[in-house]
């Protein structure tokens, strides 16, 4: 009798040990799986906003916006959908330089989701005769103007730049912008694909070295985009560099190793005059100084410039000016 009880007790002990061992194995397995999941998530490629590329808005359906605006765009870093509308219809000269559309005549509109709404910003290139009709139509469609001004000097015909802002339904705003731009001669057709590896006749490798980053060929122009180091906010919403708050530096070859340069520096107030002095010390003209937005933080000033000289000499002048700014390090 006692022997049977001992046997039953030993059997129960073995069963209890087996159950505890099974629970331990399952717990360890669950911990390992959870750890692997976290490691995979953390190692996923990320965009500039720190968001995993697996969740990029490339998967987001921007087709209705494209259809409403009448032009396709592309997804940029910072979850931005950006549409370029270069004024290839315009024949603009500054002195003896025939200005290419991607040097100083590039309209653009950018969209960024904000919950159920979308923040829209843009810069529209217009002739003087187009300004009033486009402005009025934009206001009727709920699109606000935040600036209207020149970017360069002595251009012919006279060109104006209208900066816009809206916070509303993306499709509604896209249609409003389309309807306004139809009152101008802005082309909506996609431009012919350019040769992105063409020899521009200027030493782009040296330009990259001087500027401290790689530029890109776009429509016969060599372009640099240099973000600021700090976050830019508009109405408590972050504005990514691709929405017009990065320094834009453009080189258009003009022969013999020379280039016409223009673009804009994005500056806080304490940087304005040091940048002016750096540009003038290097023979680069300052052609405009103004705001582009209304409620940004920190307060920003946009300084436009012009030069037509040896491309490497001008690049050194631009580099000297950039060194006076709080720009992101590359």
Short names for language-model regions:
Residues 25-33:
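Sec-dependent signal peptide hydrophobic core
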């Amino acid at each position: 009798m006692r022997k049977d009880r001992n046997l039953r007790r030993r059997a129960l002990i073995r069963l209890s040990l087996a159950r505890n061992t099974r629970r331990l194995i399952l717990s360890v397995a669950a911990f390992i799986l959870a750890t692997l999941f976290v490691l995979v998530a953390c190692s996923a490629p990320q965009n500039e906003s720190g968001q995993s590329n697996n969740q990029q808005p490339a998967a987001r359906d921007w087709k209705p916006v494209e259809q409403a605006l009448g032009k396709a765009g592309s997804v940029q870093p910072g979850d931005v959908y950006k549409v370029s509308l270069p004024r290839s219809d315009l024949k603009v000269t500054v002195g003896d330089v025939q200005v290419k559309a991607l040097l100083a005549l590039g309209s653009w509109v950018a969209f960024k989701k904000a919950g159920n709404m979308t923040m829209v910003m843009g810069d529209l290139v217009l002739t003087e005769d187009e300004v009033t009709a486009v402005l009025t139509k934009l206001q009727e469609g709920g699109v606000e103007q935040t600036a209207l001004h020149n970017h360069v000097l002595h251009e012919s015909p006279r060109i104006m730049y209208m900066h816009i802002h809206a916070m509303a339904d993306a499709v509604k705003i896209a249609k409003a912008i389309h309807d306004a731009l139809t009152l101008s001669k802005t082309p909506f057709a996609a431009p012919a694909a350019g040769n992105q590896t063409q020899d521009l006749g200027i030493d782009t490798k040296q330009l990259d070295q001087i500027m401290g980053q790689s530029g890109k060929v776009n429509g016969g122009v060599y372009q640099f985009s240099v973000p600021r180091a700090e976050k830019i906010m508009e109405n408590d919403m972050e504005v990514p560099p691709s929405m017009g708050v990065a320094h834009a530096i453009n080189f258009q070859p003009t022969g013999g190793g020379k280039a016409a340069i223009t673009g804009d520096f994005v500056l806080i107030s304490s940087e304005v005059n040091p940048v002016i002095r750096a540009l003038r010390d290097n023979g680069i003209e300052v052609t405009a100084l103004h705001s582009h937005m209304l409620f940004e933080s920190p307060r920003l000033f946009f300084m436009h410039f012009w030069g037509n000289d040896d491309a490497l000499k001008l690049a050194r002048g631009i580099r000297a000016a950039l060194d006076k700014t709080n720009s992101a390090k590359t």
